């Protein structure tokens, strides 16, 4: 295991000490920003005001990795980006070690485990299977897993993959070997995985499905039923950070992120996969294949069906199906190297010596190759020279305290460099509602808007409280250049800042406040069907600039309380351009002021007052915390029962290895 870890640590050597490097298109900027926020608000971070017009912190992202980064940074007095890269390097190095451990525990062969761990460390067979992946990275001998980590910022996914083989091992011990105490270990590991990354959690689900098909006939049914308590216990242990409403929103948001549809074709694909697994395991069982081989073949069928189905046929078996490449490579290498291990002792000594020498030479060449590639990806830069930093600082300077709509990679890195709140942010799983997704899609694409592109975009920007918008043109250094029509605001909005092909525009408005007095008829009552269906917005946006309505001043008191001061006439309401969430309440003059969501998902309060009025808004999720607290207590009880191993540590003989 130490050798496998050392090889990977050597590949990513520069990452252990990295600050900033030339991969500003990576989403890691958003992850580091979350850790920075935790460092700045260690006591109370239940509300996160930076993204999507403010959202509960539990909706931002699973907190496990970001909390670990923040804790490391504060303990060692490091910058958040330095701490993040240490954790990322550790995750990269430990993933193959976890695969080594699973292979060893399934076969009791250190040689097979070492070969699989090193192959996973120094090869990427997915590059041979999908031309799009080869074009993305530039060759078949390059470090795809490191490219995912650095180029795309997939650190939470790779951190989760450290846990996936370990959870499969605990499942094997629990159901195949009947060791009940491994239920508790599995629950703890699964709980950790759930608070780290959803993609890796879905990858684990693919592995568990594969394991079930591989062992279904060999394991007594009651053991499978007992194992069902593992995910129940795991979820209860972490439900405080992943409450039920958040859990239920994840599939829909993930599907919306790439257009996955759960239609008849999708269910036909799943049925085909189930049929393949059943046939493959029937054949392997008749051939008396080793349980480890059955598992890895089944795991490859599951993960390969998802990944290669996307690249070969355009299927979306799961949302974001292209992201499960590391899981597929784990499975494929475990399956490919298994026959070599079984035949190894029967090979002539000269052949074994030759294969060993060739393997050592190959590993040496690939180690140098991977190390050079990693150094190229992780070449240090002066972040102050990047457009992401410069535009973020320009937003902070030219639009102090105001909400902004930032383009592409500027939005990703914005809140590592500043505390500027954003209309959008990261990540797809965090989008509070469909209307916000419609809004930023329309602003970026202008699809079918024609000559009214600027007008539609301005309506959406004003409706969601943005006071400045940044645009990256075709010659910008910004990575994604997401605006289909980057010139649409030119001549319609005043320019606050310009550098090369990048500009920040001031969105015209009477007030920079996020609080506004409106009449009930001006509230957005119907959700727009698409980005050009702006009729529901017009009365509301016009009210924002109506000089006959009193202005409202918003001031934050602390992390989850703010006050609004205004003058009201009877029947008037206060619209606050902040995402509504259960837990928000308001008082006016010591009396409760009902708060609800409008059709855009923003807050509206009914003060039922007149004259000078001060409203105090408070986000208090105490009811949810009490409920999830009881859930955690139940989870601890179940964990204790599993740890004690009622009924004995061994409930039956281990399965024979064939």
Residue spans for each PLM region:
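Short hydrophobic alpha-helices at membrane interfaces in multi-pass membrane enzymes
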Residues: 170-191, 221-228
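Membrane-interface helix-loop-helix junctions at transmembrane boundaries of multi-pass membrane enzymes
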Residues: 178-179, 216-228, 278-304, 346-352, ...
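Signature aromatic-anchored transmembrane alpha helix within multi-pass, membrane-resident enzymes
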Residues: 231-235, 340-369, 635, 658
């Amino acid at each position: 295991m130490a050798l496998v870890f050392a090889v990977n640590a050597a590949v990513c050597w520069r990452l252990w000490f990295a600050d900033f490097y030339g991969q500003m298109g990576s989403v890691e900027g958003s992850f580091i920003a979350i850790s920075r926020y935790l460092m700045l608000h260690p006591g109370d971070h239940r509300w996160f005001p930076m993204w999507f017009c403010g959202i509960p912190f539990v909706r931002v992202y699973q907190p496990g990795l970001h909390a670990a980064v923040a804790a490391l940074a504060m303990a060692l007095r490091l910058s958040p980006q330095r701490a993040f890269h240490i954790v990322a390097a550790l995750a990269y190095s430990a993933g193959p070690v976890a695969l080594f451990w699973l292979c060893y525990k399934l076969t009791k062969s250190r040689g097979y485990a070492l070969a699989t761990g090193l192959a996973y460390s120094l090869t990427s067979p997915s590059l041979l299977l999908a031309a799009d992946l080869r074009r993305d990275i530039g060759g078949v001998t390059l470090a795809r897993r490191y490219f995912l980590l650095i180029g795309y910022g997939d650190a939470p996914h790779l951190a989760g993959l450290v846990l996936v083989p370990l959870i499969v091992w605990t499942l094997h011990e629990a159901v195949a070997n009947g060791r009940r105490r491994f239920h508790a270990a599995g629950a703890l590991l699964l709980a950790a995985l759930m608070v780290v990354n959803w993609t890796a959690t879905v990858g684990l689900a693919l592995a568990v499905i594969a394991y079930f098909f591989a062992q279904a006939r060999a394991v007594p049914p009651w053991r499978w039923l007992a194992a069902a308590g593992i995910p129940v216990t795991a979820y209860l242990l972490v439900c405080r950070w992943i409450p039920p409403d958040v859990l239920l929103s994840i599939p829909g948001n993930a599907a919306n992120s790439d257009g996955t549809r759960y239609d008849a074709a999708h269910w036909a694909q799943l049925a085909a996969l189930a049929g393949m697994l059943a046939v493959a395991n029937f054949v392997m069982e008749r051939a008396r294949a080793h349980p480890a081989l059955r598992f890895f073949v089944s795991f490859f069928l599951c993960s390969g069906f998802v990944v290669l189905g996307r690249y070969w046929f355009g299927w979306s078996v799961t949302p974001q199906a292209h992201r499960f490449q590391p899981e597929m490579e784990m499975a494929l290498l475990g399956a490919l190297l298994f026959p070599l291990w079984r035949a190894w002792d029967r090979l002539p000594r000269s052949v074994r010596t030759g294969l060993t020498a060739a393997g050592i030479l190959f590993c040496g060449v690939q180690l140098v190759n991977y190390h050079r590639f990693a150094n190229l990806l992780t070449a240090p830069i002066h972040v102050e020279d990047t457009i992401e930093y410069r535009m973020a600082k320009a937003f902070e300077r030219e639009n102090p305290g105001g909400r902004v709509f930032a383009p592409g990679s500027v939005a990703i890195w914005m809140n590592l460099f500043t505390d500027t709140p954003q209309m959008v942010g990261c990540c797809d799983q965090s989008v509070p509602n469909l209307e916000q997704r419609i809004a930023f899609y329309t602003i970026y694409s202008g699809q079918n808007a024609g000559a009214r592109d600027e007008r539609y975009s301005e309506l959406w920007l004003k409706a969601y409280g943005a006071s400045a918008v940044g645009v990256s043109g075709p010659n910008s250094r910004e990575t994604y250049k997401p605006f289909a029509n980057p010139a649409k605001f030119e001549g319609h909005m005043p320019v606050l800042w310009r550098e090369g092909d990048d500009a920040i525009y001031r969105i015209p408005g009477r007030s920079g406040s996020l609080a506004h007095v409106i009449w009930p008829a001006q509230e957005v009552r119907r959700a727009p069907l698409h980005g050009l269906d702006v009729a529901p917005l017009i009365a509301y946006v016009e009210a924002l600039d109506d000089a006959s309505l009193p202005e409202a001043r918003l001031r934050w008191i602390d992390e989850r309380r703010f006050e609004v001061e205004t003058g009201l006439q009877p029947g008037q309401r206060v619209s606050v351009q902040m995402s509504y969430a259960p837990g928000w309440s308001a008082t006016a003059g010591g009396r409760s002021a009902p708060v609800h969501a409008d059709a855009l998902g923003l807050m509206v309060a009914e003060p039922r007052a007149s004259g000078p009025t001060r409203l105090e808004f408070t986000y208090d999720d105490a009811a949810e915390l009490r409920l999830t607290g009881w859930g955690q207590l139940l989870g601890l009880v179940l964990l204790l029962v599993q740890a004690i191993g009622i009924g004995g540590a061994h409930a039956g003989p281990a399965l024979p290895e064939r």
